Amino acid sequence: MIKKMIRLNLDDLALQCGILAGTFVLTQLITACLLLFAGVRSSLQLSGVILPLASGLLLLIFTTVYTSFSFEECIRFSHTRRSALAGLLGLSLFQAAVAMGLSALLTLLEQWFTPTLWTALSGASGYELWIGGYAAGSYGTESTFLLSIDRISLPWWAVLLIALGCVLEGVFFGAFVQRFGRKGFWILWGAWMVFIFGQSVIHWDDLFHSVWFLPVLIALVVLTFLWSVWSLLRAAVRQ
């Protein structure tokens, strides 16, 4: 079932990979233009943050669509609820592995090759690399100036949590819409709008550094996923 679902949705996987590759190329073009035409003397290697987050957003969207619509289609084609859920979950996890793998590959490509390219575009005689706010070394001479490059990336465990969390929450969003229909969609949309417009009153730094934030977040994701499994295994399929 899982292999069949993967084969049937290869176009979705290609679309996700294309979006990630396009995001990578766009960020490199913007950086190159700033160095070449704006005369800036510093740059950021951000693919290690941007690409995992973009992958997570894509996984959330596609998993939501699979769960809310494709799940019922599978049941209409004589699959059991259990096999349909397993197939869609396996599909989403496979796409997560490919998306995060591509993100890691593009991040390594940026880290290996762009310092030399950016140095040439900026007219610098070398570059100074910073990782996580700490100097990691200087390369070249200071006959003109050294280009300052700050490398920012997420730790591997955060990337894994993003991938798994977005897949599980995508299942929850899809199950919510599947059970409650249009009302469920608007409830989720309203919650999202509250989250977006409530940014000014949310103290993210305090939340991220609190000892309970990550355990509570993980518990919430697990509980919503368990509810999703319960709901989908008892779902009424609309004809």
Question: What do these predicted regions represent?
Answer:
Residues M1-E72, R81-Q239:
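Hydrophobic alpha-helical transmembrane segments of membrane proteins
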